[in-house]
From Swiss-Prot:
This is Phenylalanine--tRNA ligase alpha subunit. Mg(2+) binds at E419. L-phenylalanine binds at T338, Q377, L378, E379, Y417, F442. It comes from the Archaea.
Amino acid sequence: MTVMSIQDNLTINEKKVLLALEELRSAVPDKLEEKSGLQIDAAMQAAFMLQEKELASVSEKVLERYSLTKEGEEYKKTGLPERQIIDALKNPVSLEELRSCFSPQTVGIATGWLVKKGWAKVENGIMVPSGEASEGKDEKALSAFAGKAKTLEELGADEGTVKDLLKRKLVVKHEEKFRTVSITDAGSELASQGLVLEEEIAQLTPELLKSGAWKEKKFRPYRLDITPKPLYGTKIHPYRRLIEQMRQIFLEMGFTEIKGGIIQSSFWNFDALFQPQDHPARDMQDTFHLGSTCQIPAEYSGKVAAMHENGGDIDSCGWGGIWDRELAGRNVLRTHTTSVTIKYLADNPEPPVKAFCIDRAYRRETIDPTHTPEFEQLEGVVMDKDMSFADLLGLLAEFYHRMGFEEVRFRPGYFPYTEPSVEPEVYVDGLGWVELGGAGVFRKEVTEPLGIKAPVLAWGLGVSRLAMLKLGLKDLRLLYQSDIDWLRKSEVCKI
C-alpha cells in the first residue's frame, strides 16, 4: 500500500494523533489529549486504530495499590486480635477465661493465628504463651498505611504478607491501568511525508442532501475489501431451538402437551405397559432404582395383575407366574416418557385424546459418543374411534417431513406394549437410513385394564439423535456442552 493510500485510509482523528506523536514520540493519554486537541476518549480510540495499522503502539501497565478496610482500620488502632491477647497473656489461661475478657470473635480469630505464628499453643483448653512475640510483617504493613492507597513498595511488604491481609479482609486491592502511546517507525515515516488535515464526512445525511452542502464536502473513503469482525447476536441454544420446533409442530397438529414426574413407580413405568416383571430392561444395570416405594392404584392393580398372570378377560395368555405387587410399587427414575402418557390415558379413558410429551428419561448407560444416562424423548398418543395403523404411519411421516426430512420409511419392530410395531427411519445424505425411535398400536393387554376401549396409537422418538442429524454432530455429548465458539457459529436457520 502506497503512502498516499495509507494516508487516505486514515480518519482525521488518526491524523491528529499521529502528528501529536510525531512530536512527542511517546505520550500518556492526558498529554495526547492536550497535544492533539481531541477529547481523551477520542484520542485513545484513534490510537488503538493506529495500532491496528501498525503506525502506533499502545502499552499498558497495571499498578496494584492497597488500602485498609474498616476492620483493618480498627486493627491498626487496637492491634491484631492475636497481638491484643498475647500482650495480655502473661501466664497460661483457659480459653473460657479469655472469652470473658475479650469478645468470643476476637478469641476465635486470635487462637489460630497465635498458634500459626508460634506465639502460643493450646493444651486441653488452656492457652499457653510460647516464644517471643516480636512484631510481625503483617503488623508492620498495617502500621505503614496512612491516607491514600499504597503499593507493595510503599508499604515495604512482600506479596505473601499482603496476601494474608487480603484473606483476612483487612485490606482491599485496587488496580489502576496506565497506558502509553508511542509512534512506530512506519508511523514516523508516514508523518514525515506530511499529513493533510481535512474534515471528512462519514455519513450522507438528509440535511446534507437537502442543503446541497455535500457537493463541497470530502467523504471518507470506504474499503470494501476488508472483512468486518463477526458479530454474534444472542440466540437460543440449538438443541433447545430444535425441541421448541418439535413442540410447535405437534401443537399445530392439534395435540395437547402433558408433563409428568421424573420419579415413577415401576407400576406405571413397566407393569401398566405389559412389560414382564422379569424383563431384562428392569434389571439394575439398565434402570435407576430408588430406595423408596409408593402405593399402586387399587382400581387398576387387580386387572393388571390378572393380565400379567393369565391374560385377564381377553384372548391372551399373559406372561404366566405370580405378579409381584411389591415389585410394582418400587420407585424408579423413569426409563421412558411412556410412563407419562399411559398415566394420562388412564386419567382420560374416553376418546378423543391427542397428547404429547417432550421430556427427559433416565437409564444406566455408559457415557460415550452415542449414549448418555439422561436423554430427551418425544412421546405421543392418539386415541379415537376408527384409528388405524395407517393413521400412525401418516402422522409420523408428516412430523418428519415438517422437520425437514424428505424421505421417511418404516421397518417392522417389536415392543412389549404395542402390536403392530414399527421403527421410523429417515434418509440422511452420507449416512443412509437412520432409525429414530419406535411406534405402534397399544396392545389390548395395555388398554383393557385401564378401561380404554378405543384404539391408541403411540410413539416414542429419540430427540437427541434427531438433533445430532439436524446439527451435523457425531458426538451426543456436544449437545450438552457450552462450547461458546460452536454456539456462536450455529445456524439459526438454513436459507
